[in-house]
């Protein structure tokens, strides 16, 4: 993705509000800094990039028994995790993609409640995606 996983201070993750404990180092955002944040990086970051040149790929795996259409919905919802962790995201230079796979070992409710349960899976997927992106960067070693 063209965007950054860090706030402008270079050490606070965009996904910090979704962290559990100190998994991302415990760095907290400065509210005054948040008010002054520019959403797009400077122009030099975009020079000569072709569409899809900065692709972020992810996968959501669930044990819930989902249809292909439901997997697609969960993957769509998980894109919120990209937006929570990377700023900006889904620019014309990005080819961001998320897949969802269903292990099919756990039945979820049929009928009207199924939609709610599917929403819960997608929302949890988005939270996990945000945390996974930030943790991947935080835990990476060069």
Listing of model-derived features with the role each one plays in the protein:
Residues 1-142:
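A structural signal for small-residue-enriched, beta-sheet-centric alpha/beta enzyme cores
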